[in-house]
Amino acid sequence: MANSRILNDTAIDGQIEETTAWKDFLSLIKIGIVNSNLITTFTGMWLALHISGLSFLGNINTVLLTLIGSSLIIAGSCAINNWYDRDIDHLMERTKVRPTVTGKIQPSQALWSGILLVALGLIMLLMTTVMAAVIGFIGVFTYVVLYTMWTKRRYTINTVVGSVSGAVPPLIGWTAVEGNIGVVAWVLFMILFIWQIPHFLALAIKKTEDYRAANIPMLPVVYGFEVTKRQIIVWVACLMPLPFFLGSLGLPIVILGLLLNIGWLILGLMGFRSKNIMKWATQMFVYSLNYMTIYFVAMVVLTLF
């Protein structure tokens, strides 16, 4: 009986360790970022199939290769980012529990896991089209080298540079089907590129003290909240004309885009009268998340019929 109990306890401990290790891995690859980028990748691919008149089920191999491949390169890039930033992540409340900081994942494990994931992802994208793999590589290079290693710790423009890499998933999805980049694909890229800047600036306001502690030159740290609020308004306003370039997808998508943009702009302007900037920044951040999810999912749903 005693031996049986010991064996059961040992088995439970092993299961807990496996669960913890899996959670640490998901934290390393920033699974939330991977999942959100799956939405935009799928939308780009779906619209390419829709406009080209191609069957979704008839191209299921391309769909799976693209979704898995893009997920792998994003996961790998995030792992490399965690490896590189481990020396500053312990200074910020938001990142101090990352497994590369706590020691649950060794630096070499994080680095080589990231490299392996990126390599596998690029191979899978190459099995769709060369262009998809090239764009995937550009996204990885921009995020890992231009953003993480170069601009993040040096320039306030880091947010703009990082937004380039975050905008390539729909291009990957599109080119995996088409092999070239159409007008709609470029509009999706521009929407995501511009969207990310007010999204991350709102987050930067919320986490200003974290970034200041880590000596990361985010806009609100260097120039203050008022300048950051004006920049947010400018970038949200830049989204206004983009839905008009999606007319080929139908009037409902154009109208939805305009309504989302107007709502975001109004909320942004309210920041100049808000007495609680942290509450306003949180509202802007949450709105941005809903904006991206609603608009990109709607593009798929509204083109089903």
Swiss-Prot record:
User: What GO terms describe the biological role, i.e. biological process, of this protein?
Assistant: heme O biosynthetic process
**One of the Pfam families matching this protein, by short name:** UbiA
- List the molecular function annotations (GO) for this entry: protoheme IX farnesyltransferase activity
Q: Which Gene3D superfamilies match?
A: UbiA prenyltransferase
Q: In which pathway does it act?
A: Porphyrin-containing compound metabolism; heme O biosynthesis; heme O from protoheme: step 1/1
Query: What Gene Ontology cellular-component terms does the record carry?
Result: plasma membrane
Q: Which UniProt keywords apply?
A: Cell membrane, Heme biosynthesis, Membrane, Transferase, Transmembrane, Transmembrane helix
Enzyme Commission number(s): 2.5.1.141
Q: Which domain of life is it from?
A: Bacteria
The listed locations are: Cell membrane
Q: Matching InterPro entries, A to Z? A: Protohaem_IX_farnesylTrfase, UbiA_prenyltransferase, UbiA_prenylTrfase_CS, UbiA_sf
Question: Kind of enzyme, top EC level?
Answer: transferase
Record's catalysed reaction(s): heme b + (2E,6E)-farnesyl diphosphate + H2O = Fe(II)-heme o + diphosphate
Q: Remarks, anything else?
A: Carbon 2 of the heme B porphyrin ring is defined according to the Fischer nomenclature.
Q: Which NCBIfam families match?
A: cyoE_ctaB
Give the protein's biological function. Answer: Converts heme B (protoheme IX) to heme O by substitution of the vinyl group on carbon 2 of heme B porphyrin ring with a hydroxyethyl farnesyl side group.
Q: How does it assemble?
A: Interacts with CtaA.
The record's family statement is: Belongs to the UbiA prenyltransferase family. Protoheme IX farnesyltransferase subfamily.
According to UniProt, the name of this protein is Protoheme IX farnesyltransferase 2
Name the species this protein comes from: Bacillus subtilis (strain 168)
Gene behind this chain? ctaB2
